[in-house]
Amino acid sequence: KNHKKIAYINIFENYNFAYQRQQGYLKSLKKNKINYNKNYYISVKTEEPHQSAVVIKKMLINNPEITALICSTEFSGVGAIKACTELGRKIGKDISIVTFDGPVVESLTSPPLTAITHPRKELGLKAIEMLLDMDKKNYKPQSYLAKPEIIERGSVHIV
């Protein structure tokens, strides 16, 4: 939505999913010719929204030009809502928030969070298939990437 000042809130970078999401963020910046700004990247060490909010709030105070937040988990998305609200930033008007995962907290937030989701049924079936394959003699470890979907809700705006 034309944002150029996009911050990324990650969690536990040593988790593969967190690393992959971080790489996607960096790749998207490059693809859209947006320079990476290290001040727009933080890693929170907890899934606890209130603690995430403290770190996100500090980042927004130090970088008030940020117009969008991408959160690697829905719990950090809740922390982002708290931080923005405390700073008087209107979500969906002054700042956009997009989170990965959902829909656990989607119905509990105001405005509802825009989310990047994955086909859970497809992933579950693939996980079972991979587990069953592990019993075979010539098993080789494998990975599987599923195409994500963006579900746009009230937490984004056009710049």
Whereabouts are the PLM-identified features?
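An alpha-beta-alpha
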Residues: K1-N32, Q142-V156
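Short loop/turn motifs at secondary-structure junctions
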Residues: N2-K5, N35, E65, P112
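Short acidic capping loops at alpha-helix termini that bridge into adjacent secondary structure
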Residues: K4-K5, Y36-Y40, I91-S96
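Short beta-strand elements in bilobed, periplasmic/extracellular small-molecule ligand-binding domains
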Residues: A7-Y8, L26-H50
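Conserved residues at the C-terminal ends of beta-strands
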Residues: I9-F12, I42, S72, D101
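A generic short alpha-helical patch detector that favors 3-5-residue windows
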Residues: F17, E47-E48, S72, I97
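Conserved donor sugar-nucleotide recognition element shared by glycan-biosynthetic enzymes
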Residues: F17-R21, E48-S52, R120
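Flexible loop/turn connectors
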Residues: A53-V159
